[in-house]
């Protein structure tokens, strides 16, 4: 998760990317910031400032108003590796329309879960989905191992397989209270509530300061925060 957090922070300063999506021109733009503000924890001002960030990323190569996986990986993880399980998983969770590209609404709604004011249950749900690779509603041992290995690879760490297996053993020993060889949503929630530090990387304090980071919206804002 630390790789995800570092990458999201890097979004504020990185506008790298290389792709061509001429067939998917988007004209919606910012849309209704008040509606997005009601549906997320962002204020209207934060939504408009977040849109400035989105435009910088999505127009890095062509001004198409969209972000694809390659551009997302370059901005988020500073890598253009074709195979990155961790980066792919994070992108897939952002890409709620499952069309291989991100529009602003998806971008804003996904980042909302990392806001300091986001409900803890939203953070727990997102972190659960991150490990539920097969989307079966529970986490299997192999899925945990795949994500651990992928995360270590992204951070440049190399642990012996025996050490990794030991980490997984201890995780399941505590989390799998039903002793069925898997971790369901209820068990994951209980584990996280016992160990809140597991969610420490699900909160990005800088999102509260997004209007300071990208203040240009101030000059053309159409609505006021309530």
UniProtKB/Swiss-Prot annotation:
It holds the Pfam family EF-hand_5. EF-hands 1 and 4 have been shown to bind calcium. It is not known if EF-hands 2 and 3 are capable of calcium-binding. The N-terminal 22 amino acids are necessary and sufficient for vacuolar membrane targeting. A lipid is attached at residues 4, 12, 18 (S-palmitoyl cysteine). The gene is CBL2. Homodimer. Part of a K(+)-channel calcium-sensing kinase/phosphatase complex composed by a calcium sensor CBL (CBL1, CBL2, CBL3 or CBL9), a kinase CIPK (CIPK6, CIPK16 or CIPK23), a phosphatase PP2C (AIP1) and a K(+)-channel (AKT1). Interacts with PP2CA, CIPK1, CIPK2, CIPK4, CIPK6, CIPK7, CIPK9, CIPK11, CIPK12, CIPK13, CIPK14/SR1, CIPK16, CIPK23, and CIPK24. Changing residue 143 to A: No effect on binding to CIPK14. Blockage of vesicle trafficking by Brefeldin-A does not affect S-acylation and vacuolar membrane targeting of CBL2. GO terms for molecular function: calcium ion binding; kinase binding. Disruption phenotype: No visible phenotype when grown under normal conditions; due to partial redundancy with CLB3. Chlorotic symptoms under low-K(+) stress. Clb2 and cbl3 double mutants show stunted growth, reduced fertility and necrotic lesions at leaf tips. They have also a reduced vacuolar H(+)-ATPase activity, are hypersensitive to excessive metal ions and are more tolerant to low-K(+) conditions. Belongs to the calcineurin regulatory subunit family. GO terms for cellular component: cytosolic ribosome; membrane; plant-type vacuole; plant-type vacuole membrane; plastid; vacuole. It comes from Arabidopsis thaliana (Mouse-ear cress). Transmembrane segments: none annotated. Induction: By light. Acts as a calcium sensor. CBL proteins interact with CIPK serine-threonine protein kinases. Binding of a CBL protein to the regulatory NAF domain of a CIPK protein lead to the activation of the kinase in a calcium-dependent manner. Binds four calcium ions per subunit. Mediates the activation of AKT1 by CIPK proteins (CIPK6, CIPK16, and CIPK23) in response to low potassium conditions and in the context of stomatal movement. Mediates the inactivation of the proton pump AHA2 by CIPK11. Probably involved in regulating signaling responses to abscisic acid. It comes from the Eukaryota. It is found in: Vacuole membrane. Residues 36-81, 82-117, 119-154, 163-198 form the EF-hand domain. PANTHER family: CALCINEURIN B, CALCINEURIN B-LIKE PROTEIN 2. Its main location: membrane. S-acylated in vivo by PAT10. The ratio of acylation by either palmitate or stearate between Cys-4, Cys-12 and Cys-18 is unknown. The keyword Repeat applies. Changing residue 216 to D: Increased interaction with CIPK11. Changing residue 106 to A: No effect on binding to CIPK14. Gene3D superfamilies: EF-hand. Changing residue 187 to A: No effect on binding to CIPK14. It is a lipid-anchor. This is Calcineurin B-like protein 2.
């Amino acid at each position: 998760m630390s790789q995800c957090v570092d990458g999201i922070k890097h979004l504020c300063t990185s506008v790298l990317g290389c792709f061509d999506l001429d067939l998917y021109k988007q004209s919606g733009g910012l849309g209704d910031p008040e509606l997005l503000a009601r549906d997320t924890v962002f204020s209207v001002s934060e939504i408009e400032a977040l849109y400035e960030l989105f435009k910088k990323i999505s127009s890095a190569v062509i001004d198409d108003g969209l972000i694809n996986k390659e551009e997302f990986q370059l901005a988020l993880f500073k890598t253009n590796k074709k195979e990155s399980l961790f980066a792919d998983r994070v992108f897939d969770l952002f890409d709620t329309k499952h069309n291989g590209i991100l529009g602003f609404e998806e971008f804003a709604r996904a980042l909302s879960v990392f806001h300091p004011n986001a409900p803890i249950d939203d953070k727990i749900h997102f972190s659960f989905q991150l490990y539920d690779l097969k989307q079966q509603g529970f986490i299997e041992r192999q899925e945990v191992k795949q994500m651990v290995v992928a995360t270590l690879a992204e951070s440049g760490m190399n642990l012996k397989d025996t050490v990794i297996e030991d980490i997984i053993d201890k995780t399941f020993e505590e989390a799998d209270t039903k002793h069925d060889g898997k971790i369901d949503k209820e068990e994951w929630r209980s584990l996280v509530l016992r160990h809140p530090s597991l969610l420490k990387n699900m909160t990005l304090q800088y999102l509260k300061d997004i209007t300071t980071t990208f203040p240009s919206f101030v000059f053309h804002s159409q609505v006021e925060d309530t």
